[in-house]
Structure formats: C-alpha cells, structure tokens
Swiss-Prot record:
Lineage of producing organism: Viruses, Riboviria, Orthornavirae, Negarnaviricota, Polyploviricotina
Organism: Influenza A virus (strain A/Puerto Rico/8/1934 H1N1)
Biological role: Plays an important role in promoting lung pathology in both primary viral infection and secondary bacterial infection. Promotes alteration of mitochondrial morphology, dissipation of mitochondrial membrane potential, and cell death. Alternatively, inhibits the production of interferon in the infected cell at the level of host mitochondrial antiviral signaling MAVS. Its level of expression differs greatly depending on which cell type is infected, in a manner that is independent of the levels of expression of other viral proteins. Monocytic cells are more affected than epithelial cells.
Protein known as: Protein PB1-F2
Assembly information from the UniProt record: Oligomer. Interacts with human SLC25A6/ANT3 and VDAC1. Interacts with host MAVS.
Spans traversing the lipid bilayer: none
Family statement: Belongs to the influenza viruses PB1-F2 family.
GO CC term (a single one): host cell cytosol
Length: 87
C-alpha cells in the first residue's frame, strides 16, 4: 500500500478511504474526495464543446420578437407559395 500512495492519481485526488463490508472486511472505497470536482470538470469540458451551437441558437431565438408568430408567418407564407404554384 506504500507504493500505491506514491502514484500521481492518489496524490492528486486525495486519500483512499476504506469501508467495512457486512462480513467485517475492509475494502477501499471507489470514490475519492475530488471525484465530484472531477465530474464537474468533465461536464464543463463537454459543455464548452456544445456551447457555440447553443449560443447561435439562443441568438436566433432572441432576435425573434415573438417566435410563435414568426413561425406561423413563415409557415403560412410557405403554404401560400405552394398553393400559388399549383394554380
């Protein structure tokens, strides 16, 4: 166990804590002190990848004064154009 404590993973994430099983044996816990922080970091990294698309969508959404009316207007115009072509 002395060698395990020298590994960078254990030094960077903190100490290994143990838990007692029902039969009385102690086993190392899988989670670390900083596991929550690590998960948050992973989520932030993933969000940074998706963020530019979201910004574009939000800018488009905010540029519309009333999104429902704009949607209906474009839908009616498309149908009108299709109807006009068939006549």
């Amino acid at each position: 166990m002395g060698q395990e404590q020298d590994t960078p993973w254990i030094l960077s994430t903190g100490h290994i804590s143990t838990q007692k099983r029902q039969d009385g044996q102690q086993t190392p816990k899988l989670e670390h002190r900083n596991s929550t922080r690590l998960m948050g970091h992973c989520q932030k990294t993933m969000n940074q990848v998706v963020m530019p698309k979201q910004i574009v969508y939000w800018k488009q959404w905010l540029s519309l004064r009333n999104p429902i009316l704009v949607f209906l207007k474009t839908r009616v115009l498309k149908r009108w154009r299709l109807f006009s072509k068939h006549e």
